[in-house]
Amino acid sequence: MEPSILAVRLKRLLENMIRTSSQDSGRQGVLARYLEERLRERLPPHLWPHLEQEVSVPGLAREKKWDLGLVYPAGSSLPKKPRLLISLKSILKNPSGSWPNRLDDLVGEVSSVQLLFPEVVVGYVVVLDYGAPTKRRGGVYRPPQGNELDPIYARFKQGLAALAQRRPPLWAQGLVEGC
């Protein structure tokens, strides 16, 4: 598919996602389907059946449902192993209070699964709403003024960059592959 068509489609999808209530647990489903389609275009056909949404994978602490996962082999005599796992996150409300929690989520989710499956590749897709309402004193939410969220999102991106450096020789748990 033409890159410009993909960009327009992704933009519309994200705009709709941002307009959806931050309390709607299914709001990221459209993004998961989009990513699944993009991955299928790049995977060999014999792996397509193993790419699923909402895939349950054991972790050291507990089982987690990953938004998108490539888990194979799927034969009855062979144990399933996650090869690629993708977690979708969004910050659509109160970014100043949410971004540290998203980084903590990342480290916890990734460490738990990497301790059991150290070779797994983990992706972390985050949607940031630069117009997200921010909690003010007294618990009142209001839209940001100008570029006031820029420093908050810059710190979040720095935190993600610090965690996105999993490559030889740095294979530590809690890190993800960078792009």
Feature map (PLM): residue ranges:
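Acidic, metal/cofactor-coordinating or nucleic-acid-engaging core segments within structured domains
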Residues: 94-179
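Active-site metal-binding core of divalent-cation-utilizing nuclease and nuclease-like domains
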Residues: 48-79
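Alpha-helix termini
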Residues: 43-44, 73-78, 113-117
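A short acidic, glycine/proline-enriched capping/turn motif at secondary-structure boundaries
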Residues: 75-76, 91-93
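Acidic-basic catalytic patches of nuclease active cores, encompassing PD-(D/E)XK
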Residues: 2-55
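Phosphate/oxyanion-binding active-site loops and adjacent basic polyanion-contact surfaces
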Residues: 24-32, 61-64, 98, 102
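Conserved catalytic cores of phosphodiester-cleaving nucleases, focusing on short active-site segments
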Residues: 68-70, 82-92, 106
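Short coil-to-beta-strand
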Residues: 5-6, 77-85
